[in-house]
Amino acid sequence: MIFSKLGSSLARSSRSKGFVYGGGVRSAVFNQGRLRAPQNLEAAVNQVDGGLGFLRRHFASFAARKGLEAGDLSRAFANPRLRRFFSSQTPKKKNYENYYPKDSKKAPKNEQKSESRDGSKKNENENAGDAFSNEYQNMLIPLMAIALILSTFSLGSREQQQISFQEFKNKLLEAGLVDHIDVSNKEVAKVYVRSSPKSQTTEEVVQGPGNGVPAKGRGGQYKYYFNIGSVESFEEKLEEAQEAIGVNSHDFVPVTYVSETIWYQELLRFAPTLLLVATLIFGARRMQGGLGGLGGPGGKAGRGIFNIGKAQITRADKNSKNKIYFKDVAGCEEAKQEIMEFVHFLQNPKKYEDLGAKIPKGALLVGPPGTGKTLLAKATAGESAVPFLSISGSDFMEMFVGVGPSRVRNLFQEARQCAPSIIFIDEIDAIGRARGRGGFSGGNDERESTLNQLLVEMDGFGTTAGVVVLAGTNRPDILDKALLRPGRFDRQITIDKPDIKGRDQIFQIYLKKIKLDHEPSYYSQRLAALTPGFAGADIANVCNEAALIAARHEGATVTMAHFDSAIDRVIGGLEKKNRVISKLERRTVAYHESGHAVAGWFLEHAEPLLKVTIVPRGTAALGFAQYVPNENLLMTKEQLFDMTCMTLGGRAAEQVLIGRISTGAQNDLEKVTKMTYAQVAVYGFSDKIGLLSFPQREDEFSKPYSNRTGAMIDEEVREWVGKAYKRTVELIEEHKEQVAQIAELLLEKEVLHQDDLTKVLGERPFKSGETTNYDRFKSGFEESEKESQKESVPVKPVEDDGIPPLEPQVVPT
């Protein structure tokens, strides 16, 4: 692993190759005259060029001195990168010459490339100091690894032989071969021996293991060593041994005490500290790339911990090919008109200033998810000829205290520098929540500080004109009141789910990108009638799913059948035909869905049925019935009562025709309970409760009515649901045979449409005087629109009481 890191680090740049394979005259890397600071890149390379060549030759001489052969080295260092490092051959250049021979293909040359090459050389010369420091940073770890390897070899092949004191006394001291002794660090006695006894006789010459190390300033060679317990006992034993063999005290073996520093032991002692420092340095470098500062799309690279206070701003690219314009946004014409006024003011401010008008400081885009708030902001960026800065509300929040306000200041500072400009803050509720909620400190303090800084920047002493702030959220109810006041967000632009005309326009935009077998208008009219309550994101998902289904079935074009399957996929979930269901359960599901279909068919105010199926979908639905509701802004008591009866049709069919009830009606009962509680406690339909309204609040622990009133509401809801279920059971018993026929058809076909129900049940006894969404789905609605415009009489618009348009009703089992 060390060799791999070593080879990859040394082969990182072309400049390091010369450093590795340098030699000759330039290998004098320790020349003091060359340790001056380099003036340019060439000087820097020449200064470090011969360093590893010197190490390579030193290693080769070391191997030769130890008697190592090339085969031993190749077996020891089988790593190809290490062999390439110690090779004297220059490696191949990393360019296209390795793939295309020079004679067969030549790279094109032109003046532009030569100019860029000259420019790059100039930049290299200008940044010679940085390159020089980078070279040494890259070489630091490999040099340390080489030093560790060399020290391991030198330690592993120790020349000296360890002996005991008795062997020293009998073989060396008595033979007169001891020249002198060095005691290192009061622990090890190093014995330096002569080649012949002191009496110059060569009869008993002791041969040591290999060549010894010559002593400095004395005779003898260092060949043996032994450990001593203490200095006093060693001196006593040595003196007694010399007296025993009759050595004169003047001829005693000289003993020298030396203090030596073993560098690798010191390195091991400081290894934990060095490891901690290296970890801190590595963490600091990682933080430079991962914390704060400008980054991401449109930001600057190389952000560091010291730039953490800078906002992560995304600037709109004026030259982008995928720009979005206002013509690409549909279904929200009123909101689009409001936003376009900001763009027109920034482009032509004099027109408004002459009239004495001031541009609003900001606009808050409010609406359910998927309605196109961010898409409208992208269109603003594409249409406006002024700088557009976008950021997410969560980008202001960080683990460090004070980062949020600093990023707010940095954001507005950059916006003022390029004024007139537009700032878009997506999901502003991340920092704009009302202050003081819960009374807790901690993370709320940092968020409130960020909010306070945003309030000051939008409308404070240092506020300057020319900066417009747009923000998007789907939770305007939790925003701080100071943020919503005029002077900061002057306008609140509500973007609701599109109506049938808006869905038609949105479908036409997305259908233009799909290969169809008819014109886009043919599908857009029918699909708009089929998808009430769908937002723009849902419509885009339906179109994409239809294209995917067509590709899955190897279709040349996308047809209406593919769109039907896509809508079923979006509403009901993934189709699961392979789910194991028993015959009894399948029969129960069929009668349950048949009860829904028959009950809705014979109820005047029930929504027309589109289709019913017993194919399992999603995670829990064993079947469902799909209706095409009309987008009524107002609902009457009779309409809600009929819808309650229709929802209870499945449970009534199980009881009447099968004779037992199942858990399949759990979702139906949940809808009925919620609907009935709304009629009694919210809409004021109950005579017992009176004209009171208790809408559901977030605080469920306290209720705005007494326990007695709550008991009355519960009793009234139970009574209303009982009446609805009794009426539904009577209806199912009256049409028992037809319910059974439809159930058997479902078991046979699995999917029934309205035409199949008409054959069994006949025409629906109730016909609406107005065009329904189902009629628009069958034949389009352009002609009916023209007729209604001729006969229409202007009336005062009725104010909506907060009743949302009805979505497609899916009744899972």
UniProtKB/Swiss-Prot annotation:
Residues 93-129, 764-813 are annotated as: Disordered. Residues 1-86 form a transit peptide. The keyword Methyltransferase does not apply. Binds 1 zinc ion per subunit. Keywords: ATP-binding, Hydrolase, Membrane, Metal-binding, Metalloprotease, Mitochondrion, Mitochondrion inner membrane, Nucleotide-binding, Protease, Transit peptide, Transmembrane, Transmembrane helix, Zinc. Its EC number is 3.4.24.-. It holds the Pfam family Peptidase_M41. InterPro entries: AAA+_ATPase, AAA_lid_3, ATP-dep_Zn_Metalloprotease, ATPase_AAA_core, ATPase_AAA_CS, FtsH, P-loop_NTPase, Pept_M41_FtsH_extracell. It is found in: Mitochondrion inner membrane. GO terms for cellular component: chloroplast thylakoid membrane; mitochondrial inner membrane; mitochondrion. Residues 94-125, 764-790 have a biased composition (Basic and acidic residues). This is ATP-dependent zinc metalloprotease FTSH 10, mitochondrial. It comes from Arabidopsis thaliana (Mouse-ear cress). The gene is FTSH10.
